[in-house]
């Protein structure tokens, strides 16, 4: 019985490896059900987001006000000072036109607005040191200043 289970596990592993090499594993990942709850659970458990998660965050409009503060805090902590995390959103942003992609990043900034204000950045350059994905984002500096003015 143990031998059969081990053989099955090895075959499944080989099948998964083959799927990864053929590109079908990424197809499986894109069809997975992504919700704000799964995003929040991942972030709460310290599980890194992938590009599909980032794309969901940039495009979904169903987040209600009751969840936005918690998600905003998790996203702030996931992104702040982590260039690899910022790169995921930069890559996801490439799915949109330049103007639309910039607006998506501004919406993300608004989601993290409480934490941005609490971080007490001295200036926009200090903010960019933690969030380099905003460096080329048109309108981000103005939005950043607006967040600080409104807190």
Regions found by a protein language model. Give the residues of each.
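Sec-dependent N-terminal signal peptides
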Residues: 5-14
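Residue-level detector of intrinsically disordered/flexible regions characterized by low predicted structural confidence
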Residues: 4-5, 23
